[in-house]
């Protein structure tokens, strides 16, 4: 993580600048799919979210709850870009891998994918090792002996909680998201102010 600019003078500043640039692209390009290179494999967006909201409303919804952010393809893409600036994108990538894993129906595919996910994210010294306590790590290892769609539930839940309590608040407070939310608020006909959403 970028704790001090002096420690990573070039990388952190460049990543932060890239994050702001990419969030700007989200607002000005309603069809995100037209530029698939902008956020790599996490760019799925379209000008309307799955619940029918336009992009500006989608952006403003990300601050309402972590669930709304994770349910938005644009939100996931933006959050992933932000996490890359903090060198902690493995948490979201693990969560997404678990979501895809739970959709599998073949026992053979479940077992194969489960071991891949464990090797990539869970085992000690894994390439994208997520921060889990020893008990959770060993429980997950045991679950792999008879892999089911729920074998990562505990680990996924703890990773989600960590993101919600730690990374998500910083994402909302980041200058890049605050600027984007202000622009989205002014562009949205249903929003009168960039202030906190009303609950009437």
UniProtKB/Swiss-Prot annotation:
All residue ranges annotated as the RGS domain in the record: 65-181
Record membrane topology: Lipid-anchor
PROSITE patterns on file: RGS (PS50132)
Modified residues (Phosphotyrosine): 168, 177
Cysteine-cysteine disulfides: none
Residues with a covalently attached lipid (S-palmitoyl cysteine): 2, 12
Signal peptide location: none
Domain of life: Eukaryota
GO cellular component, one term: membrane
Post-translational modification: Palmitoylated on Cys-2 and/or Cys-12.
GO biological process: G protein-coupled receptor signaling pathway; negative regulation of signal transduction
GO molecular function: GTPase activator activity
Subunit structure: Interacts with GNAI1 and GNAQ. Interacts with GNAI3, GNAI3 and GNAO1. (Microbial infection) Interacts with porcine circovirus 2 ORF3 protein.
The protein's role, per its UniProt record: Regulates G protein-coupled receptor signaling cascades. Inhibits signal transduction by increasing the GTPase activity of G protein alpha subunits, thereby driving them into their inactive GDP-bound form. Plays an important role in the phototransduction cascade by regulating the lifetime and effective concentration of activated transducin alpha. May regulate extra and intracellular mitogenic signals.
Protein name per the record: Regulator of G-protein signaling 16
Lineage: Eukaryota, Metazoa, Chordata, Craniata, Vertebrata
């Amino acid at each position: 993580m970028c704790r001090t600019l002096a420690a990573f003078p070039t990388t952190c500043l460049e990543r932060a600048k890239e994050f702001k640039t990419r969030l700007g692209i989200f607002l000005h390009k309603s069809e995100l799919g037209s530029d698939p290179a902008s956020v790599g494999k996490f760019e799925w967006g379209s000008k309307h979210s799955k619940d029918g909201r336009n992009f500006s409303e989608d952006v403003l919804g990300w601050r309402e709850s972590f669930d709304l952010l994770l349910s938005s393809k644009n939100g996931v893409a933006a959050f992933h870009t932000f996490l890359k600036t903090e060198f902690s994108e493995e948490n979201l990538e693990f969560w997404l891998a678990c979501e895809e894993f739970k959709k599998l129906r073949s026992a053979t595919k479940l077992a194969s994918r489960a071991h891949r996910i464990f090797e990539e994210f869970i085992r000690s010294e894994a390439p994208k090792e997520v921060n889990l306590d020893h008990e959770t790590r060993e429980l997950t290892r045991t679950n792999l002996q008879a892999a089911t769609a729920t074998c990562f539930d505990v680990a996924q839940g703890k990773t989600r909680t960590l993101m919600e309590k730690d990374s998500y608040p910083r994402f909302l407070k980041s200058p890049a998201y605050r600027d984007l939310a202000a622009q989205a608020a002014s562009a949205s006909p249903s929003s009168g102010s960039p202030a906190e959403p009303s609950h009437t």
